Amino acid sequence: MNLHEYQAKQLFAEFGLPIPEGYACDTPQEAFEAAGRISTAKKVVKCQVHAGGRGKAGGVELHDTKEGVKEFAQKWLGKNLVTYQTDANGQPVTKILVEEASNIANELYLGAVVDRATRKVVFMASTEGGVEIEKVAEETPELIHKAAIDPLVGPQAYQGRELAFKLGLQGDQIKQFVKIFMGLGEMFTQYDLALLEINPLVITGEGNLLCLDGKINIDSNALYRQPKLREMHDPSQEDKREAHAAQWELNYVALDGNVGCMVNGAGLAMGTMDIVNLHGGKPANFLDVGGGATKERVAEAFKIILSDDNVKAVLVNIFGGIVRCDMIAEGIIGAVKEVGVSVPVVVRLEGTNADLGRKVLAESGLDIIAAESLTDAAQKVVAAAEGK
């Protein structure tokens, strides 16, 4: 689960990290009043969406007057912001962050992520702030400095000092950096984060450190024990189909193809998408119904797939291990009858009760195309999607 910038900064403040004075606003009038409370001559106004590239898309501006701030809010609130990280429809803007402009002398990068290779939280720091860390890693990897956090003892002050030295910080800046580093380390584990970034972490003209931007991603598997963070969830930033799928414990990712896919198991789902591509098709989604699929979940999966108007055919690929193929077949039949499927449906069943599942489908009287193998299924669904 992602957080907005203003929410990330709320957590930063909770751990004593330095942030600019700012206010999250829901209406143009609130933005106007917030601008009046900020003492700096210039105000920064930012659209709050779960995507990067806001500045280049016009979603971040600098204004001298309260009226300018209000006009910006009027322009964007209720609209969609399209950036290079969104799809063509963009992300809806429901909040505007109004904050004081900062006197920036230098920009740094500080982030943390779970490193699966070392099984530790790894902090990354760089003097190349304000740009994408992926670009820095590709072009100048020697400018990224790392510190791995031992899960038994947590972040240590000496690690923060080492990073500060490598960033060229001096005097009181080192103390400030260590405080930020220690606070982020505590926050990462306490709130079950998967990723956090401060980009940029700036050095102001007065020589102080300031968290100018914030990005936080929370491990969704841990949300059950993070009620405070659950309340920060913004469903407006999610694909409606993905949000619906999550309610039914379905793993769904919308894509831009025309072949709907329903599979049990993430690996098989990825393999199914690959073989559809191999035979000239384009998957419309990734959908894993999981090992504990029920008839109800299968029916909901069908509804979600068919809610995409681009879907011209559906491929159901089930390997019966934990889940029984006959139960999946009953779910398919129920969904087809309930939803009124008007596109071709290709079904490949293998494993537990596969023969019984195929028999159930054959006796249903529905126009369902049976496939003997994965290759056969891919060829048939691609042909069906093309109207052949």
Swiss-Prot record:
Please report any disulfide bonds recorded for this protein chain, giving both cysteine positions: none
Name any one GO molecular function: magnesium ion binding
Record bears the keyword Nucleotide-binding: yes
Q: Which Gene Ontology BP terms does the record give?
A: succinyl-CoA metabolic process; tricarboxylic acid cycle
Q: What class of enzyme is it?
A: ligase
Which residues are listed for Mg(2+) binding in this entry? N199, D213
| UniProt cross-references to InterPro entries, sorted A to Z | ATP-grasp, ATP-grasp_succ-CoA_synth-type, ATP_grasp_subdomain_1, Succ-CoA_synthase_bsu_CS, SUCC_ACL_C, Succ_CoA_ligase-like_bsu, Succinyl-CoA_synth-like
- The record lists ATP as bound by K46, G53, R54, G55, E99, S102, E107
Known function: Succinyl-CoA synthetase functions in the citric acid cycle (TCA), coupling the hydrolysis of succinyl-CoA to the synthesis of either ATP or GTP and thus represents the only step of substrate-level phosphorylation in the TCA. The beta subunit provides nucleotide specificity of the enzyme and binds the substrate succinate, while the binding sites for coenzyme A and phosphate are found in the alpha subunit.
Protein name in the entry: Succinate--CoA ligase [ADP-forming] subunit beta
Which species is listed as the source?
Vibrio vulnificus (strain YJ016)
Question: Which gene underlies this protein?
Answer: sucC
